Amino acid sequence: MRGKTVRRLAVLAAVGLLCHGAWAGTWNIGILAMRGEASTRSHWQPLAKTLSQQLPGETFHIQPLDLHQMQEAVNQGTVQFVITNPAQFVQLNSHAPLRWLASLRSTRDGKAVSNVIGSVILTRRDSGITTAHDLIGKTVGAIDAQAFGGYLLGYKALSDAGLRPERDFHLRFTGFPGDALVYMLREKAVQAAIVPVCLLENMDQEGLINKKDFIALLSRPTPLPCLTSTPLYPDWSFAALPAVSDALADRVTRALFNAPAAASFHWGAPASTSQVEALLRDVRQHPQQRRLWLDVKSWLIQHQLMVGGVILAFLLLTLNYIWVMLLVRRRGKQLERNSVVLHQHERALETARQMSVLGEMTSGFAHELNQPLSAIRHYAQGCLIRLRAADEQHPLLPALEQIDQQAQRGADTLRNLRHWVSQAQGNPVLTEAWKAIAIREAIDHVWQLLRMAQQFPTVTLHTEVSAALRVTLPSVLLEQVLANIILNAAQAGATHLWIVAERTENGISIVLQDNAGGIDEALLRQAFQPFMTTRKEGMGLGLAICQRLVRYGRGDISIRNQTAPDGLSGTVVTIHFLHENGGRDGDNSSTG
């Protein structure tokens, strides 16, 4: 029985030795270096020594870090413990689940109270700045955009005073250590500075500055021997990273709580972070509400000159782009106008070319046909003279008279074409030979001349024309135009043709309506253009010649699609002659 007890004690002793060996090691404590590396090591080295003594076999080292170095060290795991203010503890805890072991209660280093944190807004006593609103337009220095005592608390105080830190005054961040910011204020590099509470008094005790040269803005009453512009919060929290075992964390916590009375630092239970977190939310720096734009904003504040240069360059490029686009738009409109004018000139040249070709063709036809027509008339008239001398009732006399009349009509047609060509070439219109023409007789004559009853027996003519209605025109001009339009309608398949003529306020109007189905709108716009036709056997000259002849008679002609009286689709041709179109009496009238 005694042997078994001895063996059990030996096993427990071995386990204890193994556990102690497992706990033994070297541990790094990352500490926020508010006043630089040398000052931080000197101030906190007694803590590392006390922990090493309280925990045999464990060695603790001090590692001074600024805000950004602290974040990087936690992310990379190069430190196992951290000592920092509650605000940074909240920030770090969002990236790694830290365990808050203790909060600092008091120190025995002979300096001003160092277990609280706040901000004091300092300015030189001889600067003339006595209120927060005197900072408008001035340069205010701070340690870092994320520094709790070195910026955020002062930022909140100035905002509560009605100032807009980013707009009402310029911010300049100097980084750690905070001593440099006080020196810059002393040398007038900045007009005010946001520094941690008690920094001024500690530097004064060390003989680095004279605190009487400075005053505090937004000063608040406090039982501490330090100036402050903000409420005070618990400072310096001791936390362990997740990599630290629970056993070691417990041993360190006991060592902190059970420090000897002569120790430099005395710790207690962790203080609440609720007030700190509420303030971080007020200044929009809480990790649970941070947004990318806040980081961008902080970066922009720290790089104002570079950002200003980039913005200026961007504005110059934008103005240059706008100017170039205005020039392009202006040149584009000018090119469009020039293009329209060019197309108009091209159409005018094309029309002139077509008219020139048409004029040459007309002149050629008139020249070539005039002599045969004259010979036909001479032969017909000679035959008439001989036959009348032999027999007044000879049966060939009516036929010869028709030959003579039709030859004369052909000659008149050629003469009208030659007059039109002469007008197109700029010669004046000769109206002495014009005469009053009965419109109803001209329609009947054309109908008989075209032999419509024999050639197109399915076409029915409907006329509403007064027998007394006359128009003063060159000989056979109206018949030429009517013949072309009537023939076009019949060849297009019309079964009914309506012709209405009436006197209007300023002339004579003749309207011809068919039911041949109408004309395509695209072709309708080019109906009077020479050489435009919808029939394979057509030359595209009929309507073009009609338009020129009507204009030669000082009138106008138009064409459009319109439903016929029988309900079928069709085309309407309207011819209008003015009263002043030229007769020697200067009038187209219904009486002739």
UniProtKB/Swiss-Prot annotation:
CDD domains referenced in this protein's UniProt entry, alphabetically: HisKA (cd00082)
Q: Which residues carry this modification: Phosphohistidine?
A: 367
InterPro entries documented for this protein = HATPase_C_sf, His_kinase_dom, HisK_dim/P_dom, HisK_dim/P_sf, Sig_transdc_His_kin-like_C, Tetrathionate_sensor_kinase
Q: How does this protein sit in the membrane?
A: Multi-pass membrane protein
Cellular compartment(s): Cell inner membrane
* Reactions performed catalytically: ATP + protein L-histidine = ADP + protein N-phospho-L-histidine
Q: Which NCBIfam families match?
A: tetrathio_HK (NF040750)
Q: What is this protein called?
A: Tetrathionate sensor histidine kinase TtrS
**Designated gene of the protein:** ttrS
